């Protein structure tokens, strides 16, 4: 799964429980890059997207992402039974191994999460007040600058990709 976040120049994510900034061009780019694939977010994040945007809202998104990605051997049978019962219902991406999905994160999250193996970062070219940070340790993550573009309310925004270094290449 690919996580999407917006950070400032000092890796700030939130201040006093709120996003630092937003930009409508970023919202458009997120919808463009995820077109045709599930885009999960919290109800808080949903408010910045158009009403007709094809997004999926999950309450306690970060909590669900923190659940173990793999079941113990003793839990496999129980998990298979549960999956059979839910077969006809829409499942969340972390219950669908191998399905390409995206999630927009606007709250504190653990980078050691096994479910998210790639991050897309929209980086504001400013420093905002922040009390929640998301730092990518250089030893664990490879950084790639994809592009710098003009936003609606920001002169420049960097689009970066971070991938786990130990990620298997196929």
Task: Please give the residue ranges for each predicted region.
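Enzymes that bind and transform nitrogen-containing heteroaromatic metabolites
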Residues: 1-170
């Amino acid at each position: 799964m690919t996580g999407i976040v917006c950070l400032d120049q000092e890796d700030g994510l939130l201040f006093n429980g709120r996003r630092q900034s937003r930009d409508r061009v970023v919202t458009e780019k997120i919808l463009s890059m995820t077109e045709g694939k599930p885009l999960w977010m919290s109800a808080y994040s949903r408010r910045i997207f158009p009403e007709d945007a094809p997004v999926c809202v999950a309450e306690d998104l970060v909590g669900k992402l923190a659940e173990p990605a793999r079941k113990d051997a003793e839990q496999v049978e129980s998990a298979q039974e549960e999956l059979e019962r839910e077969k006809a219902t829409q499942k969340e991406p972390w219950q669908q191994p191998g399905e390409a999905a995206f999630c927009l994160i606007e709250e504190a999250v653990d980078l050691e999460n096994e479910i998210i193996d790639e991050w897309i970062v929209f980086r504001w070219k400013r420093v905002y007040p922040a009390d929640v940070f998301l730092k990518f340790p250089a030893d664990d993550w490879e950084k790639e600058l994809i592009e710098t573009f003009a936003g609606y309310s920001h002169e420049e925004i960097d689009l970066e990709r971070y991938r786990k270094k130990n990620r298997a290449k196929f």
